């Protein structure tokens, strides 16, 4: 098929690695430390971590806030925060210590998004049109340009400024989603390594979230491997699934061995809350999603939509099918939520950013310049509002 991209080598200059790293660290650190919790979920997350850090084995196995059990997510996110509180207790206060892993996880997610787009951007089917006398970019340089775009699109999303700095389990889920997408892409050229990364991501997201979310991700990604020839590998079943299973059952087995009665009750509640959270949308929930999801995922979603139409002849190619295999199940869960919440919205951002970056080389230069100016204006206005809001709280 004839390439839809017309680019020269001079148009694909990549950003320095140190600059991307600095941008990610500054974004992750800004507003993370030296503050009180922003809202109830942030405060509750810290409270559970503090209870674990000061408590016993029972508190670590069954997340609770001073005796009130939280059964909507697994314990992994709380474990990381509590471990950080304990490790840094002599030097850093508990509130700031609990957020150290938040910053590290955020930077990890950024790295997964960058490398995912980089690997996809080097593939033959996405390369620019080859001119008769040369001048097109090398696959490596083109891949780096697309990877830079994916990372910047991710950091530009409005919703990330709110959810990306909280002490909640959603950030662990966020990095696991980014890892899962990376594992699927890595599996194309390194099947065993990619399958192991995918299995690790599925296992960790099980420990950090809910059974329904895990089931949706499993169905979406396994169905995609049946459609996309490049991702078919026996190692997904022979290596990936066993790793996922071992990690997923580790917490329930330990809990059942240590506190059988409490574990049975807690695990039943964990499953019940997971199922009841996706019982179908009342009208108010659908209206909430229609109003807030486009703003939360801006500017990734319009670029992803443009990418869908631009690559209409290659919709079974990995750079289209792999992100959509995660976006699709997550979007279904967003629609089926029983209560108004934007918790799941952040999980859409890693695959959306990867998919959206493939719209950039298909846009005309004028459109790209307009996007740059709009992004600058939006960030200025949004940053001013966030700063004023924080000043008013203080």
Annotate each predicted stretch with a short phrase.
Residues 27, 45-69, 76, 83-86:
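Extracytosolic helix-loop segments that constitute the early lumenal/periplasmic catalytic or substrate-binding loops
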Residues 159-172, 211-213:
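Short acidic/glycine- and proline-prone juxtamembrane loop motifs at membrane-interface regions
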Residues 100-138, 155-156, 179:
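Transmembrane-helix motifs of polytopic, lipid-linked glycan transferases
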Residues 159, 172-189, 351-355:
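Specific aromatic-rich, kink-prone transmembrane helix
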Residues 45-55, 200-342, 371-394:
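Transmembrane-lumen/periplasm boundary regions of multi-pass, lipid-linked membrane glycan transferases
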Residues 141, 145, 162, 180-197, ...:
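Membrane-interface transmembrane helices that cradle and orient dolichyl/undecaprenyl
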Residues 1-29, 236-244:
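Start-transfer (signal-anchor) and selected internal transmembrane alpha helices
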Residues 79, 88-111, 116, 143-148, ...:
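Loop-to-helix entry region of an early transmembrane alpha helix in multi-pass inner-membrane enzymes
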């Amino acid at each position: 098929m004839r390439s839809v991209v017309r680019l020269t080598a001079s148009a694909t200059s990549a950003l320095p690695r140190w600059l991307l790293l600095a941008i990610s660290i500054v974004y992750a650190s800004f507003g993370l430390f030296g503050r009180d919790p922003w809202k109830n979920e942030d405060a509750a997350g810290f409270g559970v971590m503090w209870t674990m850090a000061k408590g016993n084995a029972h508190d670590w196995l069954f997340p609770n806030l001073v005796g009130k059990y939280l059964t909507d997510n697994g314990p992994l996110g709380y474990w990381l925060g509590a471990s950080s509180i304990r490790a840094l207790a002599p030097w850093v206060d508990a509130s700031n210590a609990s957020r150290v892993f938040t910053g590290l996880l955020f930077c990890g997610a950024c790295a997964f998004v960058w490398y995912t787009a980089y690997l996809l951007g080097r593939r033959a089917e996405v390369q620019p049109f080859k001119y008769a006398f040369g001048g097109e970019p090398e696959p490596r340089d083109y891949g780096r340009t697309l990877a830079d775009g994916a990372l910047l699109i991710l950091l530009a999303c409005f919703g990330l400024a709110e959810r990306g700095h909280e002490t909640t389990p959603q950030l662990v889920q966020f990095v696991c989603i980014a890892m899962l997408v990376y594992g699927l892409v890595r599996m194309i050229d390194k099947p065993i390594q990619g399958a192991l990364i995918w299995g690790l991501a599925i296992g960790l997201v099980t420990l950090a979230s809910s059974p329904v979310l895990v089931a949706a991700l499993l169905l979406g990604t396994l169905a995609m491997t049946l459609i996309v020839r490049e991702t078919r590998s026996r190692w997904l079943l022979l290596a990936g699934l066993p790793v996922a299973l071992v990690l997923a059952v580790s917490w329930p087995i330990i809990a059942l061995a240590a506190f059988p009665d409490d574990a049975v009750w807690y695990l039943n509640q964990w499953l019940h809350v997971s199922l009841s959270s996706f019982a179908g949308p009342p009208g108010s929930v659908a209206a909430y999603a229609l109003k807030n999801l486009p703003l939360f995922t801006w500017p990734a979603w319009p670029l992803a939509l443009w990418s869908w139409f631009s690559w209409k002849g290659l919709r079974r190619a990995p750079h289209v099918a792999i992100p959509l295999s995660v976006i699709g199940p997550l979007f279904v869960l967003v629609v089926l939520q029983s209560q108004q919440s934007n918790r799941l919205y952040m999980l859409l951002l890693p695959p959306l950013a990867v998919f959206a970056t493939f719209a950039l080389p298909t846009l005309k230069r004028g459109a790209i310049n307009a996007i740059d100016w709009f992004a600058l204006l939006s960030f200025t206005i949004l940053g001013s509002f966030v700063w004023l809001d924080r000043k008013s709280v203080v």
